[in-house]
Amino acid sequence: MSGTLTFTAVTSGGVAYDVDFPLHPLTRSSQGVSDLLTALLETISSHVEKRRDLSDGDILQALCLTLAVRARMVAASPESARELVIELFDAAHRAACAASPYEAGRA
């Protein structure tokens, strides 16, 4: 499966981004990817609310450490896993940077 995952991210300040993430051709479940992305972002937001001493850099560092651990746990050589991580990150980062910010509606 390949294609695009359209995902709306909203910051705590009410700025939204509609990101069109390209999916890897071997993606098994776009809905599963979307659900996990949502759960991870919600977990980060919840944790940050409780820990005001965390900086954006601290959050990015924790995510990188998590990614390194998960990449090491997959059934692939460390170099193959690293190459895949870089490929996936670069594509996702380009998509996120291409998304224009806008004010999210308030209910």
Outline where the language-model segments fall.
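Solvent-exposed interaction surfaces and binding hotspots enriched for charged
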Residues: 1-107
